[in-house]
């Protein structure tokens, strides 16, 4: 009996020892892999910080040149033709923009290095000619390009590559906007609707803070506003914030619809892509020059500051929205986030003036809420508010973020986003689909109104969204991994 007990104990010790050795070896491999990704994240972040500084410097330079030479708005048709020709003939699917970055993150599709170069050059050209665009889209594409190519160089695969891509996105946001907290969460949240990828948290935090630090160290400057007065928490204030959140979400939905509608109408009117680029650029130039709308060109960074101090009107919000849709919806490169800041701030300033008698507080809420609801990134929105305005209005940022997020629905600027958690339980059938799939499935009342005006245009818009999302491409271009029904 004693010998049997001793034998059993020896066997148990042997098994336990083996498991300990196996667990230790596995932990060592995981630590080694994590350390490798961390080191590569630092490399990507430093490179993105330098690229972000160079990009911001180029935008400041061409903006100064344009403001001193308003005749440059006449170059909009030429710039658009050159841009769409380059992307059509040499872009290697780079025209999908941030949707390609999303798919690359989730499926492992490689991003060719020329995407970053093209978006840098063409976005700068857009701002030189006065197109109403931002900088986030270009920055994220540059960050995604850097991360994808660094990953390919060091043969990073699977989840490690995905973490590196998200870190590159975070580094881009932090470097371009000077908001490291928001940048960290943006990388974890951008690819999904209803999910925050915590597994990439350390890398995204590292990427955003290093990208921001390097960009600032090289000379990038970021101007943030302050909220003059944060109202006390009361039922009246809460009710006004909720109503404002509804307005911001509706405006964000209108913004995304406007861009899709512009794509649809121009695609219907001008089937040839070069003719379409020339015509849309000419119409945009005529609007700027004919109506003297020069200050709405480019980033329009004056809008948030003016809104906080009550120097904007509701007209400013709608003009910036329309001109941005007529810019990014026809082929010009850039981004949408900075225009969203201005649109939301102007709308919020107007709401604040008529409800509280003070535009500053609502302008700040509108600035971040428009961004978050149009891009489906509510947690990033909260962090952006804290980055830009401090934590004093933190509770209000949380409320307005989620209200506007729910009102905006599943429609968003990035058709390739995967829906992981639906915004309402009644939409659970959307889980696993892309935003493009949802737009096609549910439609939109305003889109149906447009179809009533032009019945022959039915389906054009959803096809554009699906093409941007990567769910309808030529057979020879299909990615090796699926791009939809992601869970």
Describe each region flagged by the PLM:
Residues 1-487:
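Alpha-helical transmembrane segments and immediately membrane-proximal extracytoplasmic
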């Amino acid at each position: 009996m004693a010998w049997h007990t001793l034998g059993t104990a020896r066997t148990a010790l042997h098994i336990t020892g083996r498991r300990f050795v196996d667990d230790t070896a596995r932990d060592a491999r995981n630590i080694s892999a994590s350390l490798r990704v961390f080191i590569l994240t630092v490399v990507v972040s430093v490179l993105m910080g330098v690229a972000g500084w160079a990009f911001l410097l180029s935008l400041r330079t061409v903006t100064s040149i344009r403001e001193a030479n308003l005749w440059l708005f006449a170059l909009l048709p030429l710039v658009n033709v050159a841009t769409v020709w380059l992307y059509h003939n040499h872009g290697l699917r780079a025209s999908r923009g941030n949707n390609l970055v999303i798919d690359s993150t989730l499926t492992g599709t490689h991003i060719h290095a020329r995407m970053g170069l093209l978006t840098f050059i063409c976005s700068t050209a857009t701002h030189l000619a006065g197109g109403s665009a931002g900088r986030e889209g270009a920055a994220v594409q540059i960050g995604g390009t850097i991360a994808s190519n660094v990953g390919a160089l060091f043969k990073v695969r699977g989840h490690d590559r995905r973490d590196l891509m998200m870190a590159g996105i975070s580094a881009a946001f932090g470097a371009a906007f000077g908001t490291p907290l928001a940048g960290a969460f943006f990388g974890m949240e951008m690819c999904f609707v209803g999910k925050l990828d915590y597994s990439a948290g350390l890398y995204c935090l590292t990427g955003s803070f290093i990208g921001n630090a390097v960009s600032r160290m090289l000379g990038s400057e970021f101007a943030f506003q302050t909220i003059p007065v944060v109202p006390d928490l009361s039922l009246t204030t809460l009710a006004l914030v909720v109503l404002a959140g509804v307005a911001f979400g509706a405006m964000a939905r209108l913004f995304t619809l406007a861009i899709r509608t512009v794509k649809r109408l121009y695609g219907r009117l001008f089937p040839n892509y070069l003719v379409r680029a020339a015509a849309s650029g000419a119409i945009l130039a005529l609007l700027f020059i004919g109506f003297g709308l020069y200050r709405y060109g480019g980033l329009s960074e004056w809008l948030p500051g003016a809104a906080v101090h009550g120097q904007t009107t509701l007209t400013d919000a709608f003009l910036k929205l329309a001109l941005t849709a007529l810019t990014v919806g026809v082929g010009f490169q850039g981004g949408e986030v900075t225009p969203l800041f201005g649109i939301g701030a102007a709308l919020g300033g107007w709401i604040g003036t008529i409800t509280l008698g003070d535009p500053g507080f609502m302008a700040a809420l509108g600035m971040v809420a428009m961004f978050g609801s149009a891009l489906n990134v509510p947690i990033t929105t909260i962090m952006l508010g804290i980055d830009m305005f401090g934590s004093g209005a933190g509770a209000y940022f949380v409320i307005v973020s989620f209200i506007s997020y729910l009102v905006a629905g599943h429609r968003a600027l990035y058709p390739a986003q995967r829906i992981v958690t639906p915004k309402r339980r009644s939409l659970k059938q959307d889980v696993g689909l892309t935003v493009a799939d949802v737009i096609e499935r549910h439609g939109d009342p305003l889109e149906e109104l447009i179809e009533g005006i032009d019945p022959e245009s039915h389906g054009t818009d959803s096809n554009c969204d699906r093409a941007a999302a990567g769910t309808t491409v030529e057979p020879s271009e299909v990615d090796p991994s699926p791009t939809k029904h992601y869970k």
